[in-house]
Amino acid sequence: FPSVQSNAAAYLQHLCFGDNKIKAEIRRQGGIQLLVDLLDHRMTEVHRSACGALRNLVYGKANDDNKIALKNCGGIPALVRLLRKTTDLEIRELVTGVLWNLSSCDALKMPIIQDALAVLTNAVIIPHSGWENSPLQDDRKIQLHSSQVLRNATGCLRNVSSAGEEARRRMRECDGLTDALLYVIQSALGSSEIDSKTVENCVCILRNLSYRLAAETSQGQHMGTDELDGLLCGEANGKDAESSGCWGKKKKKKKSQDQWDGVG
């Protein structure tokens, strides 16, 4: 009975909103596994309710146990499968919202990169950025900054981009990702959208991917660290890299601000 399953999942979503004790109890009763199983259901309404419940269950740093439980249930691949196949905008917003919430848990950053990076890039970030459709630039500007899906996806990648050298390598090598992120920023220049959360996410992803770029890329190893660093920082007007706010001590201070749980 799909309607019963949908209503039950929707009730769990309502029940656990803002209540960490109930969230933990749902996990102990096996509810996360049951909700993950519903992501492969044939009915769109069931997908919508299951995603809404999962989004609430994994919201907040206090619920990292729920995030890990979702991962252990095969939840990340299930979310990716649903994102790949659904055309329902609300479900796409919910799926990317769940992934953004999951991405604040350090233990899940690499699993998200392994299972979700390619689909987030190819199914969300590139098409929503407008990078491949530059002749429609004005229309795309309106769409990309009002896109909750793009905001969620860039928020997720912003968090996982801080997961270390292997994470940075995979993201740098993800075809089209950096181009699309740069296009989002470029399209916002000179408009009020320059202060949007989506643009902020894109800037922070690129900042993290530029960290130790010379030392970690074959081009940098070939040219020598000092030479490539000079090229990268040529517009810094002689300022120390730390004082530029891209890495070093300032990055450590801002780490907690760069990791949040998305849309709730």
Swiss-Prot record:
One of its GO terms (biological process) is neuron projection retraction. O-glycosylated. Phosphorylated by CDK5. Phosphorylated by GSK3B. Its main location: nucleus. Binds to E-cadherin at a juxtamembrane site within the cytoplasmic domain. Binds to PSEN1. Interacts with ZBTB33. Interacts with ARHGEF28. Interacts (via the extreme C-terminus) with FRMPD2 (via the PDZ 2 domain). Interacts with PDZD2. Interacts with CDK5. Interacts with CTNBB1. Interacts with GSK3A and GSK3B. Interacts with DNM2. Interacts with CCDC85B. ARM repeats lie at residues 20-59, 64-104, 120-162, 166-211. This is Catenin delta-2. Keywords: Cell adhesion, Cell junction, Cell projection, Developmental protein, Glycoprotein, Nucleus, Repeat, Transcription, Transcription regulation. It comes from the Eukaryota. Residues 238-264 are annotated as: Disordered. One of its GO terms (molecular function) is beta-catenin binding. Has a critical role in neuronal development, particularly in the formation and/or maintenance of dendritic spines and synapses. Involved in the regulation of canonical Wnt signaling. It probably acts on beta-catenin turnover, facilitating beta-catenin interaction with GSK3B, phosphorylation, ubiquitination and degradation. May be involved in neuronal cell adhesion and tissue morphogenesis and integrity by regulating adhesion molecules. Functions as a transcriptional activator when bound to ZBTB33. GO terms for cellular component: adherens junction; dendrite; glutamatergic synapse; nucleus; perikaryon; postsynaptic density. The keyword DNA-binding does not apply. Belongs to the beta-catenin family. Predominantly expressed in brain; accumulates in cortical neurons (at protein level). It comes from Rattus norvegicus. PANTHER family: CATENIN DELTA-2, PLAKOPHILLIN-RELATED. It is found in: Nucleus; Cell junction, Adherens junction; Cell projection, Dendrite; Perikaryon.
